[in-house]
Amino acid sequence: MGRSITTRELYDEIEAGSVPMILDVRNQDEFAAWQVEGPRPVPTRNLPIWLAVEAVDDLVKEIPADSVVICAHGNGSDLLLQMLSDEGLSVRNLEGGTSAWAELLVPKEIPDLPDGFVAWQVQRPSKACLSYVVGVPGHEAIVVDPARFTDCYLDLASSHDMRITHVIDTHVHADHITGGPALAAEVGAAYHVPIEDTGRAPTPFANDPLPDGATIALGNAAVRIMSIKMPGHTPGSTCINLPGSFLLTGDTVFVRGVGRPDLTGKAEELATELYHTVHDRLAPLDPGTMVLPAHWSFANEIAPDGLVRTELAQIFDSALLSEADMTRFIEEILTSLPSAPDTYDTIRLVNSGRQAASADEIEFLEIGKNQCAASTTT
């Protein structure tokens, strides 16, 4: 009666609202650090495995049929599944557990683009991270803010006969390990990350930083991508302007809120930069510009079409971004900052090429959703 479910199948069921319950049998501290979440809320219960195996009789009465049992790697949850099945309850085991969920990438096609131009928002539910593939079928593509699991980007490019020519990190990320240098090396593409973030010391990867206003041609120059420097979250934060009034904003602004300016240890200085970015660089743009950020914080930031996006005008409706007084703007940001995770300094060092990390260390460093927003409303 027990059976397994893949990470993508679970995501699709969460999106459809058809998961009765998730029973997470990891330790309480692991559960507190992060849970399986998707585009819709799903009832979730935490009961460590050693308690769950002693409570099978009760669980058979309390857990709905077809619920999903999860653990770190899928072994303990499979044991519990068999015990519940023996008692007549049909549940499912998440293949690979939360370790596999951490690697799930879900591409969502972005509609309403100019003719001959395609793009996808690639969602990583475990981190609430967003990356992008943008290109012209039969020609070239760029990848922006890639996760370290690169097969999804390669598959999207290959399925549309596109060659990845540029890989861009909008800034040095603090919440996850980038796949940028590895992907660029694998496909022979140029890699771009702001030198203001990496520092000017030599890096172990080739880097061709994009200056403000740089353009990248795709499809025999039929489509041009432009970089726009927007410091604030980091000194070198860059947005990517796509044809048709689409703006990949990295961590500069989100659907709700702005990027926190304290992760490089220069909170007040970068909060000032962020004020000028908001009022001098973002405000003059077309209010109908579609903002496509690098993260989300809550499921209600996901639009009905499954994309994390909103118009620039809606972002400026928030009290923070509409605040014209620089002193109050900075004060509101600085007083809204939660403590940054201890791992963020290490992740920044790894992403800037100044420190190496093993696969096990990377998995540990990436535990938990991103905490990159300075101001976010639920």
Feature locations, PLM:
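Divalent metal-coordination and catalytic microenvironments
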Residues: 134, 145, 171, 183, ...
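Active-site environment of divalent metal-dependent phosphoester hydrolases
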Residues: 29, 73-76, 150-151, 172-178, ...
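Active-site HxH/HxHxD metal-binding segment of metal-dependent hydrolases
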Residues: 128, 141, 149-226
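Rhodanese-like catalytic fold shared by cysteine-dependent sulfurtransferases
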Residues: 1-21, 28-67, 73-133, 137-140, ...
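Conserved beta-strand hairpin/beta-sheet module of binuclear metal-dependent hydrolase folds
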Residues: 27, 111-160, 240-249, 256
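Core dinuclear metal-dependent hydrolase active-site scaffold
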Residues: 7-10, 119-122, 131-135, 215-247, ...
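Active-site neighborhood of phospho(di)ester-bond hydrolases with catalytic His/Asp-centered motifs
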Residues: 71, 143-144, 163-173, 192-195, ...
